[in-house]
């Protein structure tokens, strides 16, 4: 077993996919219990950087990973997430929200920095492009909404894909059972747009 400290970019940049094994629970993190505190930490670190102060690293917690043997030249490297799937999935939603926020605020020229951490791009090396393009592959229960959420191009697209979850004025319905991926994307995207 190897222990090391990695940045988000180091975790997600290479041509690999983190898979959530079938026995793991579905995505359950929420605004009240996890997202708000994480977002405060993100903004605090960003403000430190903008003010010229070197921020202290943020410890998101330990992640236990199990690399899988590759038995073909084709296919991205696959790593099973034994512990930490809630954190890694949340990071994917945050990165997708940053991308949507950059597009919504006219800063889409910066999205390339984020896109390399969201998608595997070298399709020539993939066995199944529709699956292997994602840096993270969730449990079966979360796959449909995860794919829909990460494939949207902008906020209007998000509203269209999840039209039942929005009012006719484009706001997220209250007291509605939204897919967790939509709730995460909407929460983080709104917050990043306000911050930008």
What would you call each of these model-derived segments?
Residues 1-196:
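Glycine- and hydrophobic-rich flexible loops that cap the catalytic core of alpha/beta enzyme folds
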């Amino acid at each position: 077993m190897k222990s090391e400290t990695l940045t988000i970019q180091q975790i997600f940049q290479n041509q690999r996919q983190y898979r959530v094994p079938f026995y793991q629970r579905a995505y359950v993190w929420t605004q009240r219990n996890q997202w708000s505190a994480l977002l405060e930490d993100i903004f605090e670190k960003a403000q430190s950087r903008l003010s010229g102060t070197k921020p202290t690293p943020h410890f998101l917690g330990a992640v236990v990973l199990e690399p899988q043997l590759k038995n073909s030249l084709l296919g991205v490297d696959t790593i099973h997430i034994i512990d930490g799937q809630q954190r890694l999935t949340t990071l994917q939603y945050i990165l997708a929200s940053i991308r949507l926020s950059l597009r919504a605020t006219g800063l889409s020229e910066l999205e390339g920095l984020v896109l390399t951490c969201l998608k595997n791009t070298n399709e020539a090396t993939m066995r199944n492009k529709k699956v292997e393009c994602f840096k993270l592959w969730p449990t079966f229960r979360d796959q449909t909404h995860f794919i829909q959420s990460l494939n949207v191009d902008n906020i209007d697209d998000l509203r269209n894909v999840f039209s039942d979850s929005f009012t006719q004025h484009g706001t997220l319905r209250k007291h509605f059972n939204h897919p967790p991926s939509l709730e995460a994307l909407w929460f983080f995207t709104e917050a990043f747009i306000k911050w930008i």
